[in-house]
UniProtKB/Swiss-Prot annotation:
This is Cobyric acid synthase. One of its GO terms (molecular function) is ABC-type vitamin B12 transporter activity. Pathway: Cofactor biosynthesis; adenosylcobalamin biosynthesis. The lineage of its organism: Bacteria, Bacillati, Cyanobacteriota, Cyanophyceae, Synechococcales. The keyword Nucleotide-binding does not apply. The gene is cobQ.
């Protein structure tokens, strides 16, 4: 591999822990450098997430790197996240190299089986970027903490990559979690001298209140570490979706102007929850995350999102009683919508003849009955569907919709004599609507990103509002990417007001 580090002035964002704010800071740096006329390229050697994006070549990458690419003003490509691990439960993960699935790994065997090929994928990703962008600056994001002593020998994306590229590193610490001084000094103390020399600055993230009150703390950190504190980022609530789906339970903010309550089922193996971001951004909608075992209540609508383990999650809904609550809600005329795995769960039957999902189940089951709200049958296949789509919806009304497929299995109508089903859009395999549940229909789609489409999203919302005797909202011509641009710019404005990025660029 040729030496790509010279002349590229790579910057790297490391964190004292998972959730410190590395993704957000990296996003802000990308947009800030774009404003300065540079060509920033986000890069995370290895990410672990079930929140995926499909790029223009139909390859999988982490959604957070896609957001960073948009912030950089460029098209997301899988080379920006060459290794993606998608947790499947039971200490196993699907391994994605440069957008393609290459196998499933047990955590205990990862280093032995996948470390070398993972590093090769990372080098290939770096070469692809160097070939595609002649003059650029790599903006690297680390993962978790760089000083997990028991894991350092198999750490592909922190210090190994930083040293490989001789990157200038900034260390981000989350003061909201408490113990920020121990986070910073403890992390630095565990670094080897050559590793510590890479740390050029420190950022304090998520500070609540008057930043000037932290001045003595800032001085102490600089004196103790001999590293400058580049700034203090204030608390920015819920800017982007967290990589860890468990963080969804911490979203307790209630909207004062919410008129519509939507129950989103937090499946145990929830994936692609960024599909719900456009609804989260609607000021009149409150999303309430409901887990198996919780009481569904009386929402205006229910959404079942994507799942990494559809059969296991279906079993969880059935055994907890939440599945019956959803069926009762639908039978009383409530709106139910499923996305990808959620669509499969809403069907009549799910068959797994090849045992694709058998390893996740306590007992071997080749088929399960779904919630039977949409008359379709799903058969799981080993081949994964990975395709970007641009189609016309037939329901709730005609509208152009764009998104992507990312799933195992094929669903087809069962031609039930009791229940009629119609296609959701002009491509017959992308989704269906149960025509019997009038006036609001149970429906579902394989199309991730469907709510990003502004007109379609408002059409869907307005049928719910009509049932609730609320006025219709105006249809939107702009899609969610316009809203995302505003959020990225807002984030970057705050970043530039509080963080001395110029210090890193000049040193």
């Amino acid at each position: 591999m040729k030496n790509i580090s010279a002349g590229h002035n790579a910057l790297m964002v490391l964190g004292t822990s998972s959730g410190a704010g590395k993704s957000i800071i990296t996003t802000a740096i990308c947009r800030s450098l774009l404003r300065k006329g540079e060509v920033p390229i986000p890069f995370k050697g290895q990410n672990m997430s079930n929140n995926a994006w499909v790029d223009i070549n139909n390859g999988e990458m982490a959604y957070s790197q896609a957001v960073q690419a948009w912030a950089a003003g460029i098209e997301p490509i899988c080379a920006m996240n060459p290794v993606l691990l998608k947790p499947q439960g039971d200490c196993t993960s699907e391994v994605i190299h440069l957008g393609k699935s290459v196998g499933v790994v047990q955590a205990a065997n990862y280093y032995e089986d996948w470390f070398s090929s993972g590093w090769e994928a990372i080098q290939k990703g770096l070469n692809d970027i160097a070939t595609s962008y002649k003059k650029h600056r790599l903006i690297l994001e680390g993962a978790g903490s760089p000083v997990e002593i028991n894991l350092q020998h198999r750490d592909l994306t922190n210090l190994k990559l930083a040293k490989h590229l001789n990157a200038k590193c900034v260390l981000v610490a989350d003061i909201e979690r408490g113990g920020v001084f121990a986070q910073i000094i403890g992390t630095l103390a565990l670094l080897k001298p050559d590793e510590k020399a890479l740390i050029q600055g420190i950022i304090i993230n998520r500070f609540r209140g008057d930043i000037s009150l932290f001045e003595k703390g800032r001085q102490w950190i600089e004196e103790e570490s001999k590293i400058p504190v580049l700034g203090i980022m204030p608390w920015l609530n819920e800017i982007f979706p967290p990589e860890d789906s468990l963080d969804l339970l911490e979203r307790k903010h209630k909207k004062t102007k919410a008129e519509i309550q939507i129950a989103v089922i937090k499946l145990p193996s929830l994936s692609n929850f960024a599909d719900l971001d456009p609804l989260e951004a609607e000021p009149t909608i409150q999303l309430n995350w409901i887990q198996p075992g919780d009481y569904l209540g009386n929402p205006n609508a229910v959404i079942i999102p994507g799942s990494k383990q559809t059969l296991k999650d279906l079993q969880s809904l059935q055994s907890s009683g939440l599945g019956n609550q959803i069926k009762e809600f639908a039978s009383s005329g409530g709106t139910v919508f499923g996305i990808c795995g959620g669509l499969q769960i809403l069907g009549e039957k799910l068959e797994d003849p090849l045992g694709i999902e058998q390893s996740f189940l306590e007992t071997s089951i080749s088929e399960l009955e779904g919630l039977s709200l949409i008359p379709i049958k799903t058969i799981f296949h080993s081949k994964k569907s990975l395709t970007k789509k641009d189609v016309i919806s037939k329901w709730p009304d005609e509208s152009r919709i764009m998104g992507f497929e990312l799933h195992h299995g094929e669903s087809t109508p069962t031609n039930s004599q009791k229940v009629k089903v119609k296609d959701l859009c002009n491509e017959t395999s992308l989704g269906w609507v149960n025509e019997e549940c009038n006036p609001i229909k149970a429906a579902g789609t394989y199309l991730h990103g469907i709510f990003d489409n502004g007109t379609w999203r408002r059409l869907w919302i307005n049928q719910i509002r009509k049932k609730a005797n609320l006025y219709e909202l105006p249809l939107l011509e702009e899609n969610h990417d316009a809203k995302r641009e505003k959020v990225i710019n807002r984030l970057t404005d705050v970043f530039e007001e509080n963080i001395n990025l110029e210090y890193l660029l000049k040193t």
